């Protein structure tokens, strides 16, 4: 069985505990796979997956989450189902932060991803076109432009996550998940959280719940 | 005497306590003005000003601020000189936050402006193309995409300013200065802070300090 989480940039795959990613244009038919399940926030990439695996099944219509949130993306739903309790941060092109309590989704928010901060600043002024310094000191006021931009992006993201997690367990996934996790004690970094939510949905389908 | 603060988007003018702004392409020769002083972070717009006021004098070489910060923009320098003590937030296309203590600059940071958050999120995914909700509730977890985006931008900006100001006085200027000031008790909104710093520089020049 092959699982695929189709994001804004990459297609993320999961098979027997292994996780990898591909750009849509680099996607090639892999081994013969009997079952392929996917979720997608990117229709062109989903069409690309279906060219390669025409029998792939979209899990979105089967995914149910207890929430008052209107229009929650299917990837965030899967991440929430994947943790059941705590705060899940999916740090990719965008950073989503969602709070779960006893399998109930309490709400969440969206920030630009780290790379987006860079490109956003660049578009304001060429003077702000700097590679972010990922090692910037967050406890002292910056003393140059590159650090000022890095601090303004990274500290903002870190403080927003801190503010949302209080005493809850904190889970990180996505391309910048590992980097962000190191700002927090006891944070869990796990690139299979979304897939765990997809597997849970499959179990629920088999149990006839959905 | 006419003062001009040339930003990334607008030219901001000051004359006899009045403040107004113009887009560079809409700039027309005004009344006869004997003295014109300017600062600029935008060379094409500065050239445009000099077409209209060929005798305008750049204050940048005369502006001195006690700081360890390398490469501080001349507009931030002027804002710092304009407050002397406290935290000054200039909220335009970019948001700059600078901390002053007894006329000494302790450092500062840069975040994308509110409009930049919007356009950045739009560029990540069409699903994130929403006008920000400037009245979003910052004390409860968002329950829809538009609020999730607004909360992720506005709360991040507000928390970063809060974190930097501690017990210091807080000054706001720039296009979104008035909006942001309302999140803080006793914040001062003043669209002439940068001009006050320019006037201070002129005084110093006359006193022969520079």
From Swiss-Prot, chains A, B:
What Gene Ontology cellular-component terms does the record carry? cytoplasm
Q: Which reaction is recorded as catalysed by this protein?
A: (R)-pantothenate + ATP = (R)-4'-phosphopantothenate + ADP + H(+)
Query: Superkingdom of the source?
Result: Bacteria
**This enzyme's EC code(s):** 2.7.1.33
- Please name the GO terms of the biological process aspect recorded for this protein, alphabetically: coenzyme A biosynthetic process
**Annotated Gene Ontology MF terms?**
ATP binding; metal ion binding; pantothenate kinase activity
Subcellular location(s): the record lists: Cytoplasm
Q: Which residues bind K(+)?
A: 90
Where does this protein chiefly localize? Answer: cytoplasm
In the UniProt record, the signal sequence range is none
According to the record, cofactor stoichiometry and binding are noted as: A monovalent cation. Ammonium or potassium.
Residues that, per the record, bind ATP = 5-12, 93
The similarity comment for this entry is: Belongs to the type III pantothenate kinase family.
Protein's name according to its UniProt entry: Type III pantothenate kinase
């Amino acid at each position: 069985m092959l699982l695929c989480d189709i994001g804004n940039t990459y297609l993320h795959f999961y098979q027997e505990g292994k996780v990898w990613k591909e750009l849509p244009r680099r996607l090639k038919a892999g081994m013969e796979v009997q079952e392929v399940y996917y979720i997608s926030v990117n229709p062109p990439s989903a069409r690309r997956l279906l060219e390669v695996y025409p029998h792939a099944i979209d899990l979105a219509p089967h995914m149910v989450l207890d929430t008052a949130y209107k229009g929650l993306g299917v990837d965030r739903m899967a991440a929430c189902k994947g943790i059941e309790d705590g705060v899940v941060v999916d740090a990719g092109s965008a950073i989503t932060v969602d709070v779960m309590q006893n399998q109930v989704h309490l709400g969440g928010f969206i920030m630009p991803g780290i790379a987006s901060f860079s490109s956003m600043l660049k578009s304001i002024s060429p003077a702000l076109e700097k590679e972010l310094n990922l090692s910037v000191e967050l406890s002292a006021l910056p003393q140059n432009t590159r650090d000022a931009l890095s601090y303004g992006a990274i500290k903002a993201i870190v403080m927003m996550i801190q503010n949302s997690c209080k005493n809850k367990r904190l889970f990180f996934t996505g391309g910048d998940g590992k980097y962000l996790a190191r700002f927090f004690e006891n944070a869990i970094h796990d690139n299979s959280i979304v897939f765990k939510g997809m597997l849970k949905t499959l179990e629920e389908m088999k149990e006839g719940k959905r």
